[in-house]
Amino acid sequence: MAAVEALNRLRGLDLENATLSVWAFKKSTSRNAKFRTSSVVATPELATELKRIARQWIDRCTEVDDYSLIATINESSCLYLESDETIFPQLQDLVSSPPEEHLIEAISDLEGSLGYLIRLTIGADTLHCVCRLGSDWKVKKRAHVLNLVLNRNQLDLAGDEAFIIPKRFDFFVLNTDILVTNKGNFESILEYKKTYAISF
């Protein structure tokens, strides 16, 4: 029942009027912390687009099952578990800090990021939308191609410091509830693999 309630609450959120911050995160080499984070300032246009993508991925979820080792996800389903079963609270603590105190200082702060998340505050609720990035998320990898942008009917250079992000989110964390839309990426980001002891 908790899974269905969590999905219904997620689907009912007013994302359009939410306060948004954007964070990139990397794995930490420290023994005490699993992640390092940097915040980035999103233009109003980017904020609107990120909310639109989040809404699109939330709306496609019409079914939910409890997370398990053998559970699968189809194009209209997601899996449910509680965040305290994972290391997500460590990432959550970092992105709960004021974004302006953790702004990126150089492009290298973004290069090699494991993922990015948007943090949306809607009244008393906080929603984290998390996406794993590819291993090639580096500006220097695109030294032999041109980044172009289409503006009206004109093609122009987008500049050398362009990044590409997927139009998806791999999991959503609403307060303490996690709803997973990509099991592999979720497990990779949070180093999560639920195991079972089988008694004979």
Which residues fall in each region the model found?
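Charged, amphipathic alpha-helical stretches
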Residues: 2-50
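Acidic, low-complexity, intrinsically disordered interaction modules
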Residues: 29-199
